[in-house]
Amino acid sequence: MKNKVLGLGLGLAVVMSGSAVAAEGLDLAKASGCLACHAVEKKVVGPAWQDVAAKYKGDAAARDVLVSKVKAGGKGNWNEVTGGVPMPPYSPRVADADIEKLVDFILAL
């Protein structure tokens, strides 16, 4: 019985911490202006973040590639979605640590 309670508690902690990470990611996205062009589940101007996560799933270089893209901006990776509209650079307007948190949030979707 003790193991069941411990397992339930650990499972609940994982779910709650995942929710906290998701909430922090969305709050950071709102504060940084990301939601002007992106949404989690649907295309706005830029691709849906779920689509970004799916495209880069299993790619060991994904985090570095996306952090660089968010910092520097650019175009070309999602032309079929954006119609060629480039992503603006977010560095130095958004701190590097916050950009990394945003990318981690997106890749975890």
List each language-model region with its residue ranges.
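Bacterial N-terminal signal peptides that target proteins for export
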Residues: 1-8
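Axial heme c-ligation environment in periplasmic c-type cytochrome domains
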Residues: 45-56, 72-98
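An amphipathic alpha-helix signature
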Residues: 26, 46, 63-71, 96-103, ...
